[in-house]
Amino acid sequence: MNRRRFIKGSMAMAAVCGSSGIASLFSQAAFAAESDIADGKIVRFDFAGLQSMAQALAKKPWGGAPGPLPDTLANLTPQAYNSIQYDAAHSLWNGVANRQLDIQFFHVGMGFRRRVRMFSVDTTTHLAREIHFRPELFKYNDAGVDTTQLEGQSDLGFAGFRVFKAPELARRDVVSFLGASYFRAVDDTYQYGLSARGLAIDTYTDGQEEFPDFTAFWFDTAKPGDTTFTVYALLDSASVTGAYKFVIHCEKSQVIMDVENHLYARKDIKQLGIAPMTSMFSCGNNERRVCDTIHPQIHDSDRLAMWRGNGEWICRPLNNPQKLQFNAYMDDNPKGFGLLQLDRDFSHYQDVMGWYNKRPSLWVEPRNKWGKGAVSLMEIPTTGETLDNVVCFWQPEKAIKAGDTLAFNYRLYWSAQPPVQSPLARVMATRTGMGGFPEGWAPGEHYPDKWARRFAIDFVGGDLKAAAPKGIEPVITLSSGEAKQIEILYVEPFDGYRIQFDWYPTSDSTAPVDMRMFLRCQGEAISETWLYQYFPPAPDKRRYVDDRIMR
């Protein structure tokens, strides 16, 4: 399908283009302030029209995978692609007086083959013009691109866009949309971390995962002095189409996105992921299997946090498992969930390249009723930090059938801390290691006779201090094995309590062990719930080996 022909044909209101008076007035009044890069025909645009467009598109066959790019772009190396820079003199709102925000576009090339169309919208008249690709919008530097192959190819489109905010206009971006339906944002550290997506399809099924694309964006012209703007997007894939509205607030210490989507199923969908996010966890306090580097921890996120519909708060530390793991946490109208990076201490990472201590958390706050479903978490084995291996999303309980229409409203918070947190005691850290011996005797001259795994969970905040004289009770539930040597320790350096126990196997099974714990005082819960998944070693590995060489 020719997307340019479709988008123009789907907008019945495009008849306004025939009015030369309106067109002349609009081009002079609205687009002159935007560096004149919007050069397409004038068409009327609004969100209702975009929804109609997406609904009509769902009744047509999918247009298929992206077509080929000119060889000079298709064969770019990552280094060459990164050297292509958008010319800031041609930024979308370059001519807006007292602008606090600006937009630049990404070049197509390398793995970014989908030709994404961009439109500028005047918010007063609701008229839009397309921004066509041309080489003069970019600086190719030493990328080695043969620009003669690009001349006259206005249908190349763009790969995505990024947003800049004063006082760092044209220097450091705060929002990025690039590739399929992926997008990211930063907090006040300007350090990117995990990503979000518009939609996830069949992430964990017996079929192949499907990655929908944002194929077009419409930008409402930002007002002078404003740090909020609105962008609309058309989503398209083999199984579904969608109309999206993003109201993006670029605040001083965080980026907040109000997202509204309307989805139209082309065919039955086995697994639909709403508000999906993708992150990386290689190693941390609780999992050091592949941490043979100079860095104590390597991760974009350290936990999945959930505020369930019944009010329960959940902390689920992330893992880097040896086998792919998928867990679905059932819920009804969740209040919120997210992948968080709460450990912000540089000394815990010692990384001057990745700066993992500066990476943002991402919290999802549903704004309408989502009904029954599950917060789904997939963890994939990884040996390093260059591949994302954590996926999280909301999966509706109801099966999605061809012709179904769905709508989800939610808010995304990109910030150091989530906007809400449990008033009860919270999990600060999870640690695991050798068990079966008294603390302070690790392991001494004699290794323990019986193999065990030790877990230490640190809690802070809430009413822990007030509860301590009355008695704090750890309530531990295990899917297999036994918890022994349970200890409650006050730890002055972080002014909290450490709950420590040893897990002993009761069978030879290597199936994951689901662990659950919360703190109780006089029958009342005084902490959020800690969830964990532990992977026991094979029976022949459940022994301690003294590998000392005595001379």
Swiss-Prot record:
Where in the cell?
Periplasm
- Where is this protein chiefly located? periplasm
Looking up SUPFAM superfamilies in the UniProt record yields: E set domains, Galactose mutarotase-like
The record's listing under InterPro entries reads: Gal_mutarotase_sf_dom, GH-type_carb-bd, Glucan_biosyn_MdoD, Glucan_biosyn_MdoG/MdoD, Glucan_biosyn_MdoG_C, Ig-like_fold, Ig_E-set, TAT_signal
| Any GO BP annotation | beta-glucan biosynthetic process
Which PROSITE patterns does this UniProt record tie to the protein?
TAT
- UniProt KW keywords: Periplasm, Signal
Q: Which NCBIfam families match?
A: TAT_signal_seq
Q: Which PANTHER family match?
A: GLUCANS BIOSYNTHESIS PROTEIN, GLUCANS BIOSYNTHESIS PROTEIN D
Say what the protein does.
Probably involved in the control of the structural glucose backbone of osmoregulated periplasmic glucans (OPGs).
In Swiss-Prot or TrEMBL terms, this protein is called Glucans biosynthesis protein D
Q: Could you read off the lineage of the organism from its UniProt record?
A: Bacteria, Pseudomonadati, Pseudomonadota, Gammaproteobacteria, Enterobacterales
